[in-house]
Structure formats: structure tokens, C-alpha cells
């Protein structure tokens, strides 16, 4: 079958940037323009079809996580260094105002620094003071456990934070080096999407799809950086760092993390970026705004990990001590209350930061954040009270239960095929850490519809809470009367029920995408391409350009096909005659056959690829309905529909 005419007419690199394909065999279109040259048409293209980024690599799917580094922040920073031309403002009024850092975002970061000693384990003053009290009272066992949880959470978070810094620093250096190479006279800067390094070397073959996606993002960063070197701030960031400057940065960051101040540094950096965003002009406001959003998402992820590595075990320990001693000290109560609030707030604030950092997700309102906080507060309270009651009687069996539950949850998370990190080993470490979170609360690690997984998780939690509470009541100490035992059991089950009610309220009334109940999987969310429309001016000029460049484009495609020595990746053929089935009849459409395996890419990259292809084809062909995508492994149709319903 003859290769169809290309979809690109003015700048063939559009599909490369739009699809963000990390395939080593994909040679879509090289650059035919001088690197750095930007015309009104290319600027309109960038604004009408923003380059899909990997969003937050350390997030639930994005970002988001250990070894994957943060989202490629320079991608938006480089592109936004140019002010929006008036012609584009007239076509798309939504781009007329570049967002600034809101005062609420800056206040949230400031509150994180202000309440850092009480909520973050770097160092948590109440826990350290309590450990000192245990040591002075001769309770060496309680002193050791309290101090161990403090050190465990602090060191783990500093290691994660420094690992992210290393990845960010190396990625930025790689991108700036590539951009500076392309800016040299006579340099061959043809962009070919491959799985090589950021410089485009096709010989390097990463071992994991995550690494392919990361390198592809680096290539896009280098390409966008080379196109925005006219701005002063971007030009400064694009210069290759000297050896002395790099050494100073490494030394400073090493000292900060050795002193256990990695989170404080990131919070202060977030506030600084927010202030710069509000004070900067229109040309660089977008750049600082998105850098602030991504930095706050990173520090929220660190807060989440630190909280569940330190505050959650600390809370169970203090409640167990209170039950065993039948006494409550003021410092114990304050530490337990602060830990419980920190656990619930960590989950709610992370969801807020995650949605703010992803332009494909609707932002979550502050009322929804409060509802989420209440949901996690009551469910975690029921969980830790149950643990404390059971551990006060069965210390050994409680440890066995925790290890067994953690192993089961970790295997479940691994089975979900999370894709937060670069390497497989880092992914396993991250899944093990998330398994600790699953001991206490629900944490979504997979894109798509989570109704079934959410129901299974809370059903298991309810069974465990019931079994542990019943065993404690049957084998409790004789001095514990029913006047204490029965109210304790009532608190456990009423708190769990209250948390479930708040969860249902969130999904029924406060979810950003609207009510999530009563929707069938097939129509839960329409494809975003159906709502995509182009301005009449752009659509008319696009059709005219396509009709005028048919012959030239076909010759160029034939040349590229002969050079590559492989079959075309994208083929368009008419829809096959429909076969009798239970599905309702579909509108007549074209099927795009993609000669690639979809499952070889990370989940978010697959979703970006689908969405970008539809938008590009729908925009340039002006089809009344979006085309359907068919992969080689299209037997798993439900998986594709699952990601399509997340927009």
C-alpha cells in the first residue's frame, strides 16, 4: 500500500513533537527549518497543539517518582520564553493571559515551611522530645523505636530528594549540551525520534521503556531550547555550565541533604519561583509558574513519603504505649494528633499538587481537598487505633501481620505495572515504599478507572480491622473493662464508616471530572478529540496547504522510506466491513494502523501518543469524528479505553 501524504505541511517536525514517540524505529519527519527559527505559523502550531510532556514522572500516574526525575520543566520554560503574538491572541483568547503563581499556591508553600518542624521529619521536634523523655525515664526500648522511625523517615526522604536532584541536573546538562551543539553553524540538527541518547544517537538502546520515554523527552527539550535562545533568561540557562559552577552546585546540594534540609530547601525554592512568577514580565512568567508548580509537586511527594515512613509508625507506636500504660501524657497526645493530621493532609495536598502540575487534568478545588482530608483522616484513624489495640496484646503477631500485609500490597502494586522510575530496580524500590502507604491508607498508583481496586482495598481493610479488633476484645488484659473496650470498638467502626461516607461524597459531588458513579465504562468520558475544534482561519489555510503540497510531500515520503529501509510506521486504510456484534453501530471512520507495539511504552506515553495522533489527524483532515487507533496488540481494547477516560 502506498504511503499516504504526510499530515505536516509547514513544519514537518510537528508530528515528532506532538506524538512524542520514543520508538527506535520511528523516523517520522526531520527538521527542514533553521534551528531556532520561529514564524507566526510555528508559534500558532505550538500554542494550538502544545507539546505533550510526560507530566509528573513522580506522580501517580506521573510522577511521578524515585529515579524518573521530575517532569521536564524546561520544555514549557523554553517555549514560553517568547511572548504570545497578537494574531494568536485573537484566534485563541485563552492564551492571551499567561498564568501567574496564585497567592494561594505561594501561601501553601509558605505554610509548608512554617509548619515544617511540626509536620515534617527533618527533624520533628515532638518526636525527638518524646524520645528524650523515654530515655530519661529508662524506657530504652520505646526510646529506640521512636528514634528509629525519626531517622528512617529523614534519611529515606533525603536519599530520594538527592536522587531527584541528580537526575534533574544531569537531564538539564544533557539538554543544554544538545541545544548548544545544534546552534553551531553547519551542525546537522535533524530531529529523528529514537531511543538513543538525548543527542540522538541511535546506537544506544535503553533497557526499559521508561528510559526510552525519558530520553525522548530530553530530545524534545533540546529542540525547544534551541528555538528560544533569543530570550535572556533562557539563553543564560541554555549555556553549558562550567566545571567550577557544577562543582559548587553539587557541593551545596550535598551539604543541604547531609544536614537533612532537602525538603526545606525545596519549599524555599518553591516560594522563590512563585515570587518570581508574580514579579516577572509576560515573557518569562509562564516559565517560572510551571517550574513552581512542578517543584511543589516534587516536595509534596517527598512530604507524602516522609509522612508514611515516620509519622504513621510513630502514631501506631504512641497509641500502643498509651493503651499499655493506661496513661496519656500531653506530649504523647500532641505527637499522635500531629502525626494523624499529617498523614491525612499529606495525601490530600499531594493530590492537589499533582493535578495542578498536569495540564491534562482538571484542578481540584479546595473544598474537594477538605473532603479528601476528612476521608483519609477518619479511615487512617480507624486503622491506627485498630493497630494500637491489637499490638498492645499481640506484639509478635502484629509484626507478622504488618510484614504479610506489606508483602501482599507490594505484589499487588507490582502487578499493576506502575511506571514511575527509570530502571526496573528503582521501580521495585518505589513499589516497596508505596506498599508501606497501603498498610494505612489508599493511594492510587495507576491511571484509569479505580472503582474496582478501591472497593477491593477497602473491603480487605474492613475485614482486617474487624478481625484485629475482635481478637483484641477476646484476649484483652483483665484490667481493661468493657467500659473502655466497647467505646474503643465503636470509635474504630464509626470512624471507618465516616471516612467511607466522605469518600463517597468526594466521588459523587466534588470530583473534578464530575460525579463518578452511575457511569458505564463505555461512556464514562468522551474522547477529547471530539471536542477539539480549529479556528476557521487555521482550518482554511491548512486545507489549502495540504492540497498544494500533495506531490512534494509524497516524493519526500518515498525518499524517507527508501532511506529508512523499513515499512512505513503509519498507514491509513478504510474501515473493514462491520461484523455482527453486540456493540452499537459506529460512525463511518478511518482506521490508522500503527506498526508499533503499544505496550512497550509507559502508560502515560501511550496515552499521550493516542491523544496527540487524534488531535493532529482531526485538525489537518477536518474529519467530523475522531479516527480510531489500531495497534498490533489491539486485543486489549479495554486497556486503551481505560486511559481514554482519564482526561
From Swiss-Prot:
Modified sites of kind Phosphoserine: 197
GO annotation, biological process: apoptotic process involved in development; engulfment of apoptotic cell; phosphatidylserine exposure on apoptotic cell surface
Top-level taxonomic group: Eukaryota
InterPro entries per UniProt: XK-rel (IPR018629), XK-related_scramblase (IPR050895)
One protein family per Pfam: XK-related
Activity control mechanisms: Phospholipid scramblase activity is activated upon caspase cleavage to generate the XK-related protein 4, processed form. Does not act prior the onset of apoptosis.
The protein's name in its UniProt record: XK-related protein 4
Organism field: Rattus norvegicus
Lineage: Eukaryota, Metazoa, Chordata, Craniata, Vertebrata
Gene name as annotated: Xkr4
